[in-house]
Amino acid sequence: MSKKIIYFLCTGNSCRSQMAEGFGKHYLSDEWEVYSAGMEAHGLNPNAVKAMNEVGIDISDQTSDLIHIDLLNNADFVVTLCGDAADKCPLTPAHVKREHWGFDDPAKAEGTKEERWMVFQRVRDEIGARIKKFAETGE
């Protein structure tokens, strides 16, 4: 039996969707092929890599990719992680389940270096908890 496809989308495929892909591969890889992409490709944010390393998940080999229409149309589940992606994401066929799980953009955090870093950690933990919940309950 082939695995289902889950596709995490955000604006730049730099932070949130990259962390979601990492957590998805960690929690969901037995049943799901996990991908991420963005409306634009801003490159992998080094703080996203650092934040994920703190929880033992290496995303340093992931790439920042634009949405691939064929993958979008063949996915079983598409998850938008920011309002911009939810608004601008191309239409998906009726058979593709689509949900919005909104998270703050850690790359836009303000304050001291430590305060900005705490936002990366918080968003990472929120994304991880949401994907773990999905892995455990299917919701």
Curated annotation (Swiss-Prot):
It is an enzyme of class 1 (oxidoreductase). It comes from Shouchella clausii (strain KSM-K16) (Alkalihalobacillus clausii). It comes from the Bacteria. The gene is arsC. Its EC number is 1.20.4.4. HAMAP family: Arsenate_reduct. It catalyses: arsenate + [thioredoxin]-dithiol + H(+) = arsenite + [thioredoxin]-disulfide + H2O. This is Arsenate reductase. One of its GO terms (cellular component) is cytoplasm. SMART domains: LMWPc. It holds the Pfam family LMWPc. GO terms for biological process: response to arsenic-containing substance.
